[in-house]
Amino acid sequence: MKKIFKIILSYLLITFNTFVFAVENKGENILKIGALLPLTGELKGLGEDMLYAINLALHDIDNPKIKIYPKDSGSKKEKIIEACKEFSKEDIKIIIGPTDSEFFKELHNFEDLIFISLSNINSDPKKNIIMMGINLESQLLAIKKFIQKEKKKKTVILYPKNEYTKHVEKNIRSVNFTNTKLFSYSKDSKILTKQIEKLTSYKQRKINLNSRVKKLEGSEEPKDIRELNQLKQRYTLGKVNFDSVVIIDFGNGLKSVLTSLAYTDISEKDILIITGNQWFDDSILKETSIKNFYFPSIDLKNFKKFNEKFYEIYNYKPNEITILAYDIVGLIYYIWKNEKNINSANNFNLKTDIKGKVGKFKIFDNKVIQKLNIYKLEEGKFIKNKL
């Protein structure tokens, strides 16, 4: 199977470049798009996924005047710099990539190039870089709107202590939540549980329960007996000082937080629980600690259709962010078709919403804000919330 994929990839690379040269010799006006993707190294699989997605977009647009110039970004800045120099020499101004923001400083030196990156690490505008990733600011804006709709008044925002802590806090401030408490936690599960116990006043609520049980024990009053039987089904007694929780985490980190919340007797029936974008990760469908929670994300129907089409052609499921590469091709083509020429990143700053596979988004001052939907994880299914 791997041999088949290698043949397909090699064919795409040859096809891209063969048709480019053929059209250039005719002197036709073509849309030249560079693709700066990791085609070697640890992220090689992601780079190949992106290239296949670009090919799908070309097929759907069906305009022979669009030509792709793939170059390997590898994993070292020297390789990226070399590729960018080649793009400049070949007069290729619009580049899909890179996939992350690690070497953005180096890209700033190539002012003649426009980079449409798949990174989501920042939504701050850059002179020659537009980041199309599902950024945290877009997620928080959708979450804020949802919290307001649900009429929640006291929110706790939880996020891990790591290299992205300052980035998270900066975005939270920019969205301007009201009546919100910020709470950073340790990735160590033992420390995390103690932190959540403190946040939820777990020990005091446990004491409240035991005290009430002792008070009712021995009473022969029917109402006391009924209350006692109900209390014996509980783990704590008393309310917490918040009505909603936002967890900026994913994967095992998110699962650890959900487990700690369940352990401290925080129920989704009483507290609105929201997480960051989960990309419809199937593994969270098996989550048993807290079964119902909400998260912002892209259009689920389009996401499923894209993955199904990708699987139908390439016989495997792509990385979740692959759909962004497809949308980027469509975006570049839309701008080129309407503007006739793309000279700088400013050409992408449109006053109207743009609709892609991921859903609607807007670009202004080189900044991308996605209009994300809210989904609920309920009984092992992803359900779109009606706003």
How should each PLM-predicted stretch be described?
Residues 2-8, 13, 20-387:
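Extracytosolic ligand-binding ectodomains
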